[in-house]
């Protein structure tokens, strides 16, 4: 049997993989209440169909820190901060594409249910701020839809309440 990592006992679960299908995270428990991790995701093209914006696609990766009020591997209230780098691609009704990239910061509060089979369900919500700048554009017409794409990204730069749901397995 391998020796425990960083002072853990043999029965402690230090790692967890969590997913919401389009978002995945791998975390390491620093102690009973604190965890750090890496997350990544890709949200496939989402139909917007508003103000000449047809679809929005996002991809991102970054780091997270979690604090559980009782413990990471038990039923507990929690706060998680996410810092990530990402990109967004907007497609307008004329087929033009506009690519944006930058960073984002989110703080989520919620509750985690931890089951005896090492499965956890995490539910929460919190604000999201992102700062993405236009990197490139592939214009198909002269109808000026780039302005509509910029306005859509501006609307998404601060979202006051973003839902958060993950299912995880600790090991």
Task: State the predicted function of each range.
Residues 25:
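Short, surface-exposed charged micro-motifs
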Residues 116-171:
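Predominantly the C-terminal beta-signal and adjacent terminal strand-loop region
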Residues 8-10, 21, 29:
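A membrane-pore/channel beta-structure motif
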Residues 13-15, 20-22, 55-61, 99-105, ...:
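Residues that define the transmembrane beta-barrel architecture of outer-membrane proteins
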Residues 28-123, 131, 167-171:
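Gram-negative (and chloroplast) outer-membrane scaffold detector with strong preference
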